[in-house]
Each structure stands twice: as C-alpha cells, then as structure tokens.
Amino acid sequence: MPRFENSFVVDQQIDSVWKFYTDIKHLEIITPKKLELKIIKCTNPEIILGQECWIEGKIIMKKIKWHSKITFFRKHEYTDEMIEGPFKKWIHTHRFSDLGNMKTKIIDEIEYELPFGLLRKMLNKYSKIQLEKIFNHRKNITCLKLNKK
C-alpha cells in the first residue's frame, strides 16, 4: 500500500499550531484553491475523537465527495480515516512535535490505496506528485498564517 510522508517546521509554539489545526476550518484555508474544497458538514467544529466530516472538492477536474472520521485523538496527534470517497483506503495521521525555541514540527503520514485495479500503478505515481504539490501548498500557507512575526 502506498505511503506519503511530509514534514516541515513552523516558527510558532506548539499550542498555537495545535489550535489552528484542530479547528476544522483550517482545511479550507490550507488547501489549494483549485481543489475547491468546501466543508459541507461536521459533527463538531473542533477536531475530536469520533468527529465526522463531509467535504466536497475537485480531483482531476471532477467534483468528489469525501466522508471522514477521526479515529484516533490525543494531544498533538490525530488520525482521520476516509469512510467514503475517491480512494479505496485513506488513513491520514497528523502529528505535532515541540522543538523548543517557538518552533513546531508538523508531520503528516498518509496510507492510501487507489481504486481502478490495473490503472492503480500508473495512478500511484500521479497521486504522489499531486500530494507533494498539495502538501507544499499547505506548508506555505501554514507558515504564512502561523510564523511568528
């Protein structure tokens, strides 16, 4: 099963980063505009264990719907799993590490599986490239919003 990992450091204390990332609205802020991501409904405005969200967006010019659930939650770490959506499987773990000196490391680990049988191998490469672009954008926006002035 393919894995995608990404990490970066933001110049901000961990509690401020945690507060930003556990407000579900952050997702619309850090996602590239071309994906047209919209949060349709969530069972809670803050990310907590058991929270479910329904999201809409675009992937490869096609509107998709995504239903996810927070399946693991503790201070400075949570995991969301796709219940229904464009992937056969999607498990995304978010971790935040205090580096001291007003620096926080943000770590994303994603295990995913694409549908499409025989096309899967070809699409895996494309998916990794797209994930790299999306998470580079997330890094840039997060740093813009949170880096201490």
Language-model features and meaning:
Residues 3-4, 37-40, 53-54, 78-79, ...:
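Short structured motifs
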Residues 17-21, 27, 53, 70, ...:
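Hydrophobic pocket/interface hotspot
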Residues 4-6, 53-55, 66-68, 92, ...:
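Hydrophobic residues positioned within well-ordered beta-strands of beta-sheet architectures
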Residues 82-133:
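Beta-strand/loop substructures that line and gate deep hydrophobic ligand-binding cavities in soluble
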Residues 140-149:
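Charged phosphate-binding loop/patch that engages nucleotide di/tri-phosphates or the phosphate backbone
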Residues 7-11, 69-71, 95-97, 111-113:
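Generic structural detector for well-ordered beta-strands
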Residues 58-103, 148:
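Hydrophobic-ligand binding "helix-grip"
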Residues 1-48:
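Hydrophobic ligand-binding cavity/cleft-lining segments
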